[in-house]
Amino acid sequence: MKKRILMIAALAVLAAGCAELLKVLETVAPAALTEQEVISGLKEALITGAKNSAGRLSLTDGYYSDLAIKVLLPEEAKVIVDNISKIPGGDKLVEDVIIRINRAAEDAAKEVAPVFVSAVTQMTIADGFNILRGEDNAATQYLHSTTYNELYSLYKPKIAVSTEKKIIAGISTKESWETLTGKWNSFAGTLAGRLAGFNTVNTEIDDYLTKKALDGLFMKIAEEELKIRKDVSARVTPLLQKVFGSLDAK
C-alpha cells in the first residue's frame, strides 16, 4: 500500500513538472510562421535591401569608388585603353568617360527602389517559402530572374537621360564616348590600323551601361540579403526578426 501511495505521489509530481515544462516551452518557443508573415517578411527584406543598396549607389562615387561594381569601359574598348598614349589627350579623355559613365549610373540608381517595390508585389506564397528555405541569395535570384527584363526596359531610358546630361564643359557622357570611339575608329579603320590588327568599337553605350549598372545593383542586393539572413542586427523590424529568426536554429 505504501509503495502504491509513493508511486501515485511520484506520478503526480512528474505530471505537475511536465505541465510546468509545457507552459515554459509555450512561452519561449516561437509560434509557427503563417503564410502571410513569410510573404510580408520577404517582401520587407527585398524592399529594405533594394532601398539600402540603391541609396548608397545613388550617392556621388557610389559606383565610381566601389571597385567591385565600378563601371569601366566595355571590353571591346580595351585596345583603346592599351594604346591610348598614341592619341593626343587620350588618357584624360578615357578617364572623363569613365567618371561620367559612373555618374550616370549613380543618377539612375535614385530611381531603382520604386521599381523593386512594385516588382516584389508579384511574389506568391510558394515563391516565399522556396526563397525562405533556399540559398543565401535565393531572394536576389528570384528577383533577378523575374524582373530583369522589366527593370532593363524601365532603367535604360533613365540611363539614356543621364548619359545625355551635360556634365563637364557642356559635354555629355554619350558625346564623350562617341568622341573617344570616333577617334579610335578613325585610326583603326585606316590601312595602318588594319595592318596592326586593330578593330573598330561599336558598343552601344546605353545598353552596356544599363546591364553593368543592374549587375552591380543586384550584387549589392545579394549582399544585403546575406546580412539579413546571417546578421541579427540587420533585421531592423520585428517581422524580419521573426521570419529570418526561424532559420537561425537550422
Range-by-range predicted roles:
Residues E95-K165:
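Mid-length scaffold segments of soluble, non-membrane domains
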Residues A169-P238:
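A structured, mid-to-C-terminal "fold-capping" secondary-structure block
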Residues A19-L22:
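Bacterial signal peptide processing site
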Residues L247-K250:
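Non-transmembrane, aqueous-exposed alpha-helical and coiled segments at domain scale
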Residues V24-E26, A31-L72:
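Post-signal-peptide N-terminal segment of Sec-exported extracytoplasmic proteins
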Residues M1-R4:
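Positively charged n-region of N-terminal signal peptides that target proteins for export
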Residues S58-R103, P114:
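Signal peptide-directed extracytoplasmic domains
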